[in-house]
């Protein structure tokens, strides 16, 4: 049976979230289901207090706390932390992202093949 990853999209650009949703629908092994979306790190943090997901596709640069700050906050909290794949137009933040235990770092525009590879890495990590 093909696993289904529960994905939370966090990006301040609605069109970027729409594009990611479309790309995720094309992924088949593993499959991905978008369980929620947020346009700001503060919204994401509030949602994550009461919900869980397997993966957060997280933009780096957003108004208010950015994606790197959100990842740092999530890493410090108690309990399991979802896998994080950063999705951004800014490649210069990659090193910091991996210091925060990111599974991958995708640059925009995201290609389906790269997203599929990142989903496979997340599924492997969850299976361990």
Regions picked out by a protein language model, each given a short descriptive name:
Residues 6, 33-34, 81-84:
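Short active-site oxyanion
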Residues 10-11, 38, 56, 88:
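Conserved sequence signature across two-component system core domains
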Residues 35-44:
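Conserved Asp/Asn-Gly motif in the active-site loop of CheY-like receiver
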């Amino acid at each position: 049976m093909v696993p289904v990853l529960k994905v939370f999209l966090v990006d301040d650009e609605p069109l970027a979230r729409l594009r990611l949703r479309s790309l995720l629908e094309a992924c088949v092994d593993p499959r991905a289901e978008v369980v929620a979306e947020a346009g700001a790190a503060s919204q994401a943090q509030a949602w994550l207090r009461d919900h869980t997901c397997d993966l957060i596709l997280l933009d780096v640069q957003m108004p208010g706390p950015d994606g790197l700050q959100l990842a740092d906050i999530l890493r410090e909290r108690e309990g399991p932390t979802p896998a994080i794949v950063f999705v951004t137009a800014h490649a210069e933040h990659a090193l910091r992202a991996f210091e925060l235990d990111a599974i991958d770092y995708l640059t925009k525009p995201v290609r389906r093949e790269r997203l599929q590879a990142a989903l496979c890495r997340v599924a492997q990590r969850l299976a361990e």
